Amino acid sequence: MSENTRKVTVAVIGSGNIGTDLMIKVIRHSDVLQMGAMVGIDPDSDGLARARRLGVPTTAVGVHGLLELPNFDEIDVVFDATSAKAHAANAALLEPLGKRLIDLTPAALGPFVVPAVNLDEHRHAANVNMVTCGGQATIPIVAAVSRVTPVAYAEIVASIASKSAGPGTRANIDEFTETTSHAIETVGGARRGKAIIVLNPADPPLIMRDTVLCLISARDPATHDAIRNSIQAMVEHVATYVPGYRLKQQVQITPVPDGQPVHTLLASGDTAAPTHQVSVFLEVEGAAHYLPAYAGNLDIMTSAAVRYAESVADTIAAPAATQGATR
């Protein structure tokens, strides 16, 4: 960001775990973004209390309160960390007013963005969707495999600490699986995708763990090596904005046993039987900016959202000198 470009002013709707972590990331770690408002519906929420202590304008009456804030016109980008249902209503109010929306719910009204895979494809979109925590963790791996060889079927299992799943996450379980499955195909490149989420009740809580299984038709050892290299490169890429993202163990590529009914998993019309399964085991440790380190599932969502917002800042923030000349 050049010295002549102003910072991008953002608002966060949702004063729960995700929204509060977003605010902390913007205030403490972004040279490009600045907080303009924190929006909630519970005046006693910790997120709103923290925002007030940090000098961030707040409202406890939802998006309508955001519209009434004196600095509303200065806000460029709105992060929505509410719920899929609430996002539809929020978007209907904010999009006509020219606000760029970054949706952290499974609503999926706009195109999917997974920064490690398609960061530059939707730079001017009015509303983008950050898929889900499981999608942000696993879709890069599916994409890494599909860049080397076609993926007939990809299945992901995201295991998150039950304590990290707030009411919004729990209310959106069905939307989580549907949205993630769709994004595995459209962003990850799999012919067919499936997503499963597990709320792990272990105490003390365990960090986020993800399993990615891809069915491929590739017998050549050189192709297998290329897949491993592609996955390793992708893990390193994601770790540039989510430092706690890592492989739990070595990538496994094993033959599909004879007689295994994998044809039941294939997309309609696909007849070629996959020859091998790629198995990838990941863990995501949170940065603990606001949330505990075990909440890597939430940290990867907020980190991805901030990464996207920073990457498109140049499409939003006009040079300060130009602004002054046009007033």
Curated annotation (Swiss-Prot):
Residues engaged in binding NAD(+): 15-18, 164-172, 297
Protein name according to UniProt: Acetaldehyde dehydrogenase 6
Residues of the active site: 133 (acyl-thioester intermediate)
Catalyzed reactions: acetaldehyde + NAD(+) + CoA = acetyl-CoA + NADH + H(+)
Keywords recorded for this protein, A-Z: Aromatic hydrocarbons catabolism, NAD, Oxidoreductase, Plasmid
GO molecular function: acetaldehyde dehydrogenase (acetylating) activity; NAD binding
Naturally occurring in which organism (per UniProt): Rhodococcus opacus (strain B4)
Annotated EC: 1.2.1.10
One GO biological process term: catabolic process
Coiled-coil portions: none
InterPro entries with a match to the protein in the record: Acetaldehyde_dehydrogenase (IPR003361), Acetylaldehyde_DH_C (IPR015426), NAD(P)-bd_dom_sf (IPR036291), Semialdehyde_DH_NAD-bd (IPR000534)
The organism's place on the tree of life at top rank: Bacteria
Similarity section: Belongs to the acetaldehyde dehydrogenase family.
